[in-house]
């Protein structure tokens, strides 16, 4: 990149940072937490194998399978991940002119990406020939004087041409790209340094990135203070590389995440509720600076990069999260609807239960859902020991769980809060739930479940005041409560064992939770989950954890709406 182009590119980046600062967040703790999870759970011998296969000039289906398997292992270990989300862009916050621009730019971006991945220059073949046929083809092309026979694809910065000889090219989608947590973990483990040393090195790199794109000279100077940066290979292309390669781009991205309050684009989180605002802000910068989609195949400029990443998933951290589970490309997962005027459901942008009600959608359970709930509740034994726990306030609960150890049956569901200010406090110091994850919860389920509990039931709990207030607010004074009143330490004795055994039962507690210490300061703790609390309280009383298989009473499509209207953008 020439100096003038680099200056213009960074100007775009800086302007996007300023305009999108409201969507940026401090994610250093979450990135480091994911890196620690990878350090403890990832097979680094397999990481080394994948790094080796990524250096091969030609890679086949077996190599792709190993890459995909390792990517899946990483995805299973980290919390920062993007999820599949189909976005339909309609007139709303975005004007019809905005939609026309987005539609045109997505089409241009599609053409550029396809040309970059499958170049059309003479002698280039990216089809499905076998390795033997490719060798034979190379020899024949050389024989007739076509020098292109020596190349099966575009050479990277290190001069090595690498080809994927696979049957299904779609399996390559979303298997590349770098993750700061993975870069941090690989630097730490394979560089044989302390995690903190890697964090400090990347932080300094990130600080330079606030003022310019770090280059080879910058890296050489930083290496004098941080020898771990010697592992960064500045010749590594950012095209079609795995997240296990030590490219300068991967290190810079990780460094951006180490900064608190840096308004770095890498820290943006997008959701169906914020996507319209993000795209609107991007288009504002595009118009002000004349940003555009380049016709030249190759690396993406800042506008191309952010447009692709935002439109790929629409739910997660577009720059830094694991996207292994996402299928399709940006132009497939975000569709521009130029025909609909969006009038039938000009709902609140947060897509919450209240906005859905105002748009004409049912607030409570339907008759068929009530009948399904009634049948499901028959799985509970009215006379069996039953634990109950809630998160949130009794007048505004956000998570409720009931658990019967004898059968392994449990009821576990969530509710959107009405007091957002109090919710954020509770999230910080107790449950760590992201309010946007509650927008898809089923309204009215709390009242319906409590109403369906057996008459004169006896419920055991750790602390009964809040649960009693909740039950009485729903007219269930007939339910008896037994408060075991254990100390905080005793009640959470089996906390780690419970999370280790049953962590797959709940993925809602994504935030960082801290506890204030008596002598000042704060300490990070495990988020409180109503279901996990029920299980660990029972283990504390029983003197051990029963690792039986647990069974959900409520079907998932009752806990979370699966047929919510598409978001109007």
Curated annotation (Swiss-Prot):
The record marks 466 as: Important for exonuclease activity. Changing residue 466 to A: Loss of RNase activity. GO terms for cellular component: helical viral capsid; host cell cytoplasm; ribonucleoprotein complex; viral nucleocapsid. Zn(2+) binds at residues 399, 506, 509, 529. Its main location: virion. Encapsidates the genome, protecting it from nucleases. The encapsidated genomic RNA is termed the nucleocapsid (NC). Serves as template for viral transcription and replication. The increased presence of protein N in host cell does not seem to trigger the switch from transcription to replication as observed in other negative strain RNA viruses. Homomultimerizes to form the nucleocapsid. Binds to viral genomic RNA. Interacts with glycoprotein G2. Interacts with protein Z; this interaction probably directs the encapsidated genome to budding sites. Interacts with protein L; this interaction does not interfere with Z-L interaction. Interacts with host IKBKE (via Protein kinase domain); the interaction inhibits IKBKE kinase activity. The N-terminal region is important for the cap-binding activity while the C-terminal region contains the 3'-5' exoribonuclease activity. A CCHE zinc binding site is present in the C-terminal region and may thus contribute to the substrate binding and/or the specificity of the exonuclease activity. This is Nucleoprotein. It comes from Lassa virus (strain Mouse/Sierra Leone/Josiah/1976) (LASV). The gene is N.
């Amino acid at each position: 990149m020439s100096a003038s182009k680099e200056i213009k590119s960074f100007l775009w980046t800086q302007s996007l940072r300023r305009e999108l600062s409201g969507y940026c967040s401090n994610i250093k703790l979450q990135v480091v937490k994911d890196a620690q999870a990878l350090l403890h759970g990832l097979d680094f011998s397999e990481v080394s194998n994948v790094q080796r296969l990524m250096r091969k000039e030609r890679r086949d289906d077996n190599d792709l399978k190993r890459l995909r398997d390792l990517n899946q292992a990483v995805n299973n270990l980290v919390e920062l991940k993007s999820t599949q989300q189909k976005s339909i862009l309609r007139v709303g916050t975005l004007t019809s002119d905005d939609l026309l621009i987005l539609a045109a730019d997505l089409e241009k971006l599609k053409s550029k990406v396809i040309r970059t991945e499958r170049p059309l220059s003479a002698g280039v073949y990216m089809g499905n020939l076998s390795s033997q046929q490719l060798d034979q083809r190379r020899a024949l092309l050389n024989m007739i004087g076509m020098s292109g026979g020596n190349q099966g694809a575009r050479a990277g910065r290190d001069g090595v041409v690498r080809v994927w000889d696979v049957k299904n090219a779609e399996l390559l989608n979303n298997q590349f790209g770098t993750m700061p947590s993975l870069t941090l973990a690989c630097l730490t483990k394979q560089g044989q340094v302390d995690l903190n040393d890697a964090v400090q090195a990347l932080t300094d790199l990130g600080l330079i990135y606030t003022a310019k794109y770090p280059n080879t000279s910058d890296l050489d100077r930083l290496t004098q203070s941080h020898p771990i940066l010697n592992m960064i290979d500045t010749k590594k292309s950012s095209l079609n590389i795995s997240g296990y390669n030590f490219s300068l781009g991967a290190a810079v991205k990780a460094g951006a995440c180490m900064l608190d309050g840096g308004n770095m684009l890498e820290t943006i989180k997008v959701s169906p509720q914020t996507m319209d605002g993000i795209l609107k802000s991007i288009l504002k910068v595009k118009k002000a600076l004349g940003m555009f989609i380049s016709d030249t195949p190759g690396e993406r400029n800042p506008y191309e990069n952010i447009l692709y990443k935002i439109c790929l998933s629409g739910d997660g951290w577009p720059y830094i999260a694991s996207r292994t589970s996402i299928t399709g490309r940006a132009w497939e997962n975000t569709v521009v609807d130029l025909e609909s005027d969006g009038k039938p459901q000009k709902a609140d942008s947060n897509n919450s239960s209240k906005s859905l009600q105002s748009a004409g959608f049912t607030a409570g359970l339907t008759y068929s859902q009530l009948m399904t709930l009634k049948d499901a509740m028959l799985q509970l034994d009215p006379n069996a020991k039953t634990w109950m726990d809630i998160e949130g306030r009794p007048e505004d609960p956000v998570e409720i769980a009931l658990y019967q150890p004898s059968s392994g049956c449990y009821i576990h569901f969530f509710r959107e809060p009405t007091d957002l200010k109090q919710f954020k406090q509770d999230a910080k110091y107790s449950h760590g739930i992201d309010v946007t994850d509650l927008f898809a919860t089923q309204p009215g389920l709390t009242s319906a479940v409590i109403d369906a509990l057996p008459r004169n039931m006896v419920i055991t709990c750790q602390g009964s005041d809040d649960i009693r207030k909740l039950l009485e607010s729903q007219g269930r004074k007939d339910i008896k409560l037994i408060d075991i009143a254990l100390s905080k330490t005793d009640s959470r004795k089996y906390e780690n064992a419970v999370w280790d055994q049953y962590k797959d039962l709940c993925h809602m507690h994504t935030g960082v939770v801290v506890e204030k210490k008596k002598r000042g300061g704060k300490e990070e703790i495990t988020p409180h989950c109503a279901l996990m609390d029920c299980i660990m309280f029972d283990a504390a009383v029983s003197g051990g954890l029963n690792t039986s298989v647990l069974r959900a009473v409520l079907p998932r499509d009752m806990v979370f709406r699966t047929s919510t209207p598409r978001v109007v953008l």
